[in-house]
Amino acid sequence: MLVPLSLLQKFFSSPLSIEEILQACDRIGIEAECSNVFPDSLNTVVTGKILSASPHPDAERLTVAIVFDGKGERQIICGAPNCRAGIIVPIALPGAKLRNASGEITTIKKAKVRGLESQGMCCGADELGFPHLQKAERGIFEFPADTPLGESACMLLAGAPLECSLTPNLGHCASLLGLAREISFLSPVSLNIPEEFSFASLPQETSICDMHDAGACPIFYSVKISGLSCRRSPEYLQAALTALGQKPLNAIVDITNYVMLSLGQPLHAYDSQAVEQKSLHAATLQSAQPLTLLNQETYTLPAGSLVVADQHNILGLAGVMGSAASSCSENTTEIILEAAYFQPQAVRKYQRTIQLHTEAAYRFTRGVDPQGVLPVLHAAIHMIQSLFPDAQISPIQKIGDDSFSPLSLSVRPKTIKRLLDIEFSTAEIVAKLSSLGFQTAVEEQAVRVEVPSYRHDIQEETDLVEEICRTTPFVQKTQKILPTYTPIYSLKRELTAFLANGGLQQFFTYSLLDTEVSSLSLQESSLIPVQNSSWKLRDSLLPGMLKSAATNLHRQAPYVYAFEIGNVYSKEQNRYQEEERVAILLSRQVMDDSWQGKTPLSFYTIKGWVEKLLCQSGASIEDFSLQPSQHPNFHPYQQAALYQKKHLLGIFGTLHPQLCRKAQIKHDVVFAELSLNVLLSLKKKSGPHYVPYPIYPASSRDITITIDRDLPADLVRRELLSFESKWLESVHIVSVYQGRDSASQSKNVSLRMVFRDHERTLSGQEIEEEYERLTALLDKKLANIGQGNS
């Protein structure tokens, strides 16, 4: 964004230096750079006021002008037809170098013209390198009457080249007013609204339109203005627009562009001859329709697009660009000026679909000030009246509700302490947020904050903490050495090294999936495609990994052993979630050419990798339980879900044959996907450690118990391990038997209990007594679902 310093300074109560402005931009979070693009010789072209102008005694086409250049008076002989007393013009002092019409450079010197000395030159815009600002007739350039004297004329014409790069969250700074407001909060000056944007409120009429989409456009204003002409803008307005990076067109369009760039609210002027019944509203298209816009390109607007229309015709794509049919031409004498608040998500939805980027869309997609729509419209009307004193203004038509309920948030000192490691009292919090334009009120152990209407980037408590942070000098911030790695990063490094050393290749796949890749999943995603396109965020690492595996296998890779660590996305209860996961994919035979024959991959192959992954993560396998799973991407009888209490760690097993056929893979594929966050929460601080071999023998006893067929056998094993016993070392499942009778509702589970004391050898009687005690506890525990006996 181009920001002319000369225009920006108008919004301050007193001037700021370039250094002060750049420092404030740094604190706001804006990357700003200012460089002088003019040669040094043009720095001697300054603004001066013609005090008197009299005809040359020896040349009827020349004028003798007495000019004050801010330091003193000087005599200049001028041949421009518009040279007259009272105007402020560019003055080239002796030593300045100007390029003439033929391209030759001329050095300005003191000289005698027809016997009278000329101590400089009054310049036109074309002579300074701004030919587009020059009027059709030749003449010297005229500055506004309030232009300071002795200032660099080129800097005023082009506006010192301050270039600002705005991040997406700083949409409220995408105007001179927005940027000046933020700078004033962090500088010793106050905000000042220039007189050219002052206005008097005009009468309003509320209209009701059944076709208006109040959801996508809460408030819509329009006003009819007649008695106009699309002549060229005054030179000062052309200069200001050029400095802001816009090409001047005509007075009406230039005013709407200038007001938008200055105040941040896009406006649009329609030729009223193209508007039926002189009435506009915002409507949503029910079906796709073509529309030719101002750039003379025809676009197919998708269904759901928000448009500005009259009773029968589409006159513009709301928040993006008007139609060619309703544009202002040299014959336009009456316009309908529109100002509205379009919801950012509504504009963003179709603006990206048709790939049309405009200054208006840039602002609407980031959010404009809903309470600034009417004041900006009044300011534009005021500027039109100043250029066209005979213009007739009709009452403003309002559609929708202009009431506004500010977002209310609370910020707590303990949250600031946790995030910034700085302690602030409630009084300090109130002072800092109040200085940034927030309305505050002290509550118990918190500060209640009302967010201004223009701050769309403030949505939660952490955003307010960020505001407090940027008003806090670095010297107040705690200085401490950050940890080398975060725990999650360290875990990812460990797992990456472990899996790579185990012979697995690391995959890196895209988070955005197209239609082809996203089809490699039989699970329906809760995420919708991005902006009505075919791309959507992945909710699993499987589709991308399966596509990459298929590509490598089709290129005759002997096998694919791969893993990936990445983010997946989901939507639960209208909230979007992001989670990091680790996934393993194995495909084809393990030993294809071995003399032993083919050893196919199976459920137990991937189960072994999952167990090794848990051990490497520092988690105990005993902390987890396997439970039946019915995930559509896996074989219905070869999959399992891994739980830690009630927390799902992940799912693993053999992929569904239908999914393999979709990917055109002829061999079985086994896959596992685990949550890194759950793994991290279970990681033991001590990590793996050495355990010596026992020196005393163990004794085992078997038990067979009958339970309901739907209960997992591992449930019995875990129940036994849950009983307090100083000798029970481990419990293993020996077998699970279910009769051939399909009507049977029970199954037999055989388990082996291992007993050991690490300080002595247990006697047979001690083992039997402990065995009987544990089986009795188990029978009692499972009394409602089955009976067990040894």
UniProtKB/Swiss-Prot annotation:
Belongs to the phenylalanyl-tRNA synthetase beta subunit family. Type 1 subfamily. Its cofactor is Mg(2+). GO terms for biological process: phenylalanyl-tRNA aminoacylation. InterPro entries: aa-tRNA-synth_II/BPL/LPL, B3/B4_tRNA-bd, DNA-bd_dom_put_sf, Fdx_antiC-bd, Fdx_antiC-bd_sf, NA-bd_OB-fold, Phe-tRNA-ligase_IIc_bsu, Phe-tRNA-ligase_IIc_bsu_bact. This is Phenylalanine--tRNA ligase beta subunit. Keywords: Aminoacyl-tRNA synthetase, ATP-binding, Cytoplasm, Ligase, Magnesium, Metal-binding, Nucleotide-binding, Protein biosynthesis, RNA-binding, tRNA-binding. It catalyses: tRNA(Phe) + L-phenylalanine + ATP = L-phenylalanyl-tRNA(Phe) + AMP + diphosphate + H(+). Tetramer of two alpha and two beta subunits. Residues 39-154 form the tRNA-binding domain. CDD domains: PheRS_beta_core (cd00769), tRNA_bind_bactPheRS (cd02796). Mg(2+) binds at residues 457, 463, 466-467. Signal peptide: none annotated. One of its GO terms (molecular function) is ATP binding. One of its GO terms (cellular component) is phenylalanine-tRNA ligase complex. PANTHER family: PHENYLALANINE--TRNA LIGASE BETA SUBUNIT, PHENYLALANYL-TRNA SYNTHETASE BETA CHAIN AND LEUCINE-RICH REPEAT-CONTAINING PROTEIN 47. It is found in: Cytoplasm. It is an enzyme of class 6 (ligase). SMART domains: B3_4 (SM00873), B5 (SM00874), FDX-ACB (SM00896). It comes from Chlamydia trachomatis serovar A (strain ATCC VR-571B / DSM 19440 / HAR-13). Its main location: cytoplasm. Residues 404-483 form the B5 domain. Binds 2 magnesium ions per tetramer. Pfam families: B3_4 (PF03483), B5 (PF03484), FDX-ACB (PF03147), tRNA_bind (PF01588), tRNA_synthFbeta (PF17759). Its EC number is 6.1.1.20.
